[in-house]
């Protein structure tokens, strides 16, 4: 068997380790004590003895008699009613006062001359209105008795008629008179072609407005021979007389021949004759 002999005295290394261990142990205890929550000290509640109402009254009376405290004065009715009126009620009061019509009160002591003048001026203003109303109703009744139709108000908005005309406005790059004649010859009889060469635009006048409408609908915004054409109805339409219109001369001459100058109106009244004695 082998016996191990431990010396009683510690070596220098062991003593150094033991001292470090003791230091760490102290630090650990101090850290735990710092982290632990500290119990808050109980606050001592000071209980006040409630005073009796009778005792308070007696103390107040004694102080008033001695002159240390002034007595409380009662408020009068005027002080109680003097409150600030809200702004909303003031506005409502103003509006009602403005809308009310002044009326004459002969037995009122507060009636003044200004109110009377305003009433008289209002009565004077009302008189022409009443006369106009009377005239209006009188004329309406008279029209009903005669059986005349009611007047149609002129203010009624009538729908605007669509624009129509024989002349169209054509614009495009390098547009010429021959080009316009060739392009629009298929849509109807061309009466006149006028050009503005500097601005590359022109005006084409057809014999009928239907030809102008068809040309606008089919050619506006399209490319013809590499030229983008903008076709619109011209603002100013020159007056063009219809060509080869059969109803222009023959029809109107027949109508004029069938009607006499006196017209077809016959007078159905009877002739009234008076005696000579009645006239004298």
Swiss-Prot record:
The disulfides recorded in the entry are none
Q: Which GO terms describe its biological process?
A: negative regulation of DNA-templated transcription, elongation; negative regulation of transcription by RNA polymerase II; negative regulation of transcription elongation by RNA polymerase II; positive regulation of transcription by RNA polymerase II
**Which part of the chain is the RRM domain?**
166-236
The UniProt entry's coiled-coil ranges are none
Record region (Disordered): 25-112, 141-166
Its primary localisation, in coarse terms, equals nucleus
Q: Where is the composition biased (Basic residues)?
A: 25-36
Q: What is this protein called?
A: Negative elongation factor E
Q: Which organism is it from?
A: Drosophila melanogaster (Fruit fly)
PROSITE patterns (alphabetical): RRM
Q: From the Swiss-Prot or TrEMBL record, what is one GO molecular function term?
A: RNA binding
Q: Where in the cell is it found?
A: Nucleus; Chromosome
Pfam family name, one: RRM_1
Database matches in InterPro entries: NELFE, NELFE_RRM, Nucleotide-bd_a/b_plait_sf, RBD_domain_sf, RRM_dom
Q: Which domain of life is it from?
A: Eukaryota
Q: What does this protein do?
A: Essential component of the NELF complex, a complex that negatively regulates the elongation of transcription by RNA polymerase II by RNA polymerase II. The NELF complex, which acts via an association with the DSIF complex, causes transcriptional pausing.
Listed Polar residues bias regions: 73-83, 97-112
Q: Assembly state and interactors?
A: Component of the NELF complex, which is at least composed of TH1/Nelf-D and Nelf-E.
What ranges does the record list as Basic and acidic residues composition bias?
Answer: 49-61, 87-96, 141-163
Q: Check the record and name the Gene3D superfamilies matching this protein.
A: 3.30.70.330
An annotated GO cellular component of this protein is: nucleus
Q: Which UniProt keywords apply?
A: Chromosome, Nucleus, Repressor, RNA-binding, Transcription, Transcription regulation
Q: Which family does it belong to?
A: Belongs to the RRM NELF-E family.
């Amino acid at each position: 068997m082998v016996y191990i002999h431990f010396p009683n005295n510690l070596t220098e290394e062991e003593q150094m380790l033991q001292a470090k261990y003791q230091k760490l142990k102290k630090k650990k205890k101090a850290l735990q004590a710092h982290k632990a929550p500290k119990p808050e000290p109980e606050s001592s509640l000071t209980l006040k003895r409630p005073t009796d109402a009778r005792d308070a009254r007696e103390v107040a009376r004694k102080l008033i008699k001695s002159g240390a405290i002034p007595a409380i004065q009662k408020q009068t009715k005027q002080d109680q009613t003097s409150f600030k009126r809200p702004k909303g009620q003031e506005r409502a009061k103003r509006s009602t006062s403005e809308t009310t019509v002044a009326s004459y009160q002969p037995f009122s002591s507060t009636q003044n001359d200004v109110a009377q003048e305003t009433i008289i001026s209002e009565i004077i203003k009302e008189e022409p209105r009443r006369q106009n109303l009377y005239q209006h109703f009188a004329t309406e009744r008279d029209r009903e008795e005669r059986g005349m139709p009611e007047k149609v108000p002129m203010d009624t908005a009538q729908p605007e008629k669509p624009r129509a005309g024989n002349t169209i406005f054509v614009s495009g790059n390098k547009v010429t008179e021959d080009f316009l004649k060739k392009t629009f010859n298929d849509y109807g009889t061309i009466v006149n072609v006028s050009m503005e060469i500097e601005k590359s635009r022109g005006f084409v006048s057809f014999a009928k407005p239907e030809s102008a409408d068809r040309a606008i609908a089919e050619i506006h915004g399209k490319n013809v021979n590499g030229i983008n054409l903008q076709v619109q109805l011209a603002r100013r339409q020159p007056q063009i007389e219809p060509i080869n219109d059969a109803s222009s001369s023959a029809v109107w001459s027949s109508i004029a021949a069938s009607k006499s100058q006196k017209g077809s109106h016959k007078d159905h009244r009877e002739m009234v004759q008076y005696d000579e004695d009645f006239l004298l």
